[in-house]
């Protein structure tokens, strides 16, 4: 049976000499895999729509296992991402996170819109660190993880200075600091952003300017939390970190 849907290319894998298996996140069907015959050939009609991060309309032949891609029509190429190595690193990380954090053939329109908005924001020049952090935090509930970000995990206080307790799964206020000597320090700005990322709709995000110190705090908390609770390993994380370090080095050289 032929099925038409909109989807975003999460990843591609070579299959044989000329074919590709394309993993798509679709609004209607969730995450699916389709076989694109001949897509490795440069002149193939399926080659252009088999590119990572592409947003397109796909026509495929559905089956109980792997579907077969018949044709497609590009909606948005996300060209700026694919032409920029730094943006490619962030997009690959976000795509792999959503890929690893979701099951196949389970429709999730929220997740589809989240991925689409994140790719659009990266493509349009929004700070990639902020986009990556926001997606990381948004994905927690998708994976069944719910850190306490509204009040202190111990005394339930909603005011004061908050740090983050990995052990106790959430914010810990200054009155309870002694209960976790290994808590991760947070500035008020970082605490606000963590809460904002968890609840805020990405489509409403404007131009955000965040200090590097705040970014570093967010990165430490989020990555430590993922390492402790998520149970997933992302190959693209190392690539993203390498690109991030390279960007910082280039920035330091330009200042000197």
UniProtKB/Swiss-Prot annotation:
Cystine residue pairs: none
SUPFAM superfamilies: ArfGap/RecO-like zinc finger, Nucleic acid-binding proteins
Taxonomy, superkingdom: Bacteria
Entries under Gene3D superfamilies matching the protein: Nucleic acid-binding proteins (2.40.50.140), Recombination protein O, C-terminal domain (1.20.1440.120)
Alphabetical list of InterPro entries matching this protein: ARFGAP/RecO, DNA_rep/recomb_RecO_N, NA-bd_OB-fold, RecO, RecO_C
UniProt KW keywords: DNA damage, DNA recombination, DNA repair
One BP term from GO: double-strand break repair
A Pfam family this chain is assigned to: RecO_C
GO CC, any one term: bacterial nucleoid
Similarity comment: Belongs to the RecO family.
Function: Involved in DNA repair and RecF pathway recombination.
Protein name listed in UniProt: DNA repair protein RecO
Organism expressing this protein natively: Bacillus licheniformis (strain ATCC 14580 / DSM 13 / JCM 2505 / CCUG 7422 / NBRC 12200 / NCIMB 9375 / NCTC 10341 / NRRL NRS-1264 / Gibson 46)
């Amino acid at each position: 049976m032929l099925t038409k849907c909109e989807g975003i290319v999460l990843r591609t894998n070579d299959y044989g000499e000329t074919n590709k298996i394309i993993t798509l996140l679709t609004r209607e069907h969730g995450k699916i895999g389709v076989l694109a015959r001949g897509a490795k050939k440069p002149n193939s009609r399926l080659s252009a729509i088999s590119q990572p991060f592409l947003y397109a309309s796909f026509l495929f032949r559905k089956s109980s296992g792997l579907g077969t891609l018949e044709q497609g029509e590009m909606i948005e190429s996300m060209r700026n991402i694919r032409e920029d190595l730094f943006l490619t690193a962030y997009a690959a990380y976000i795509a792999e996170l959503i890929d690893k954090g979701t099951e196949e053939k389970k429709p999730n329109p929220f997740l589809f819109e989240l991925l689409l908005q994140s790719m659009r924001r990266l493509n349009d020049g929004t700070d990639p660190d902020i986009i990556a952090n926001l997606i990381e935090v948004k994905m927690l509930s998708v994976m069944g993880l719910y850190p306490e970000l509204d009040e202190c995990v111990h005394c339930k206080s909603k005011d004061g200075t908050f740090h983050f307790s990995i052990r106790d799964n959430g914010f810990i206020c200054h009155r309870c600091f002694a209960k976790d000597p290994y808590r991760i320090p947070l500035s008020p700005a970082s605490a606000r952003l963590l809460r904002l990322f968890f609840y805020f709709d990405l489509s409403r995000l404007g131009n955000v300017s965040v200090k590097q110190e705040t970014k570093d705090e967010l990165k430490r908390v989020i990555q430590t939390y993922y390492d402790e609770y998520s149970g997933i390993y992302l190959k693209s994380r190392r690539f993203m970190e390498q690109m991030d370090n390279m960007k910082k080095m280039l920035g330091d050289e330009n200042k000197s």
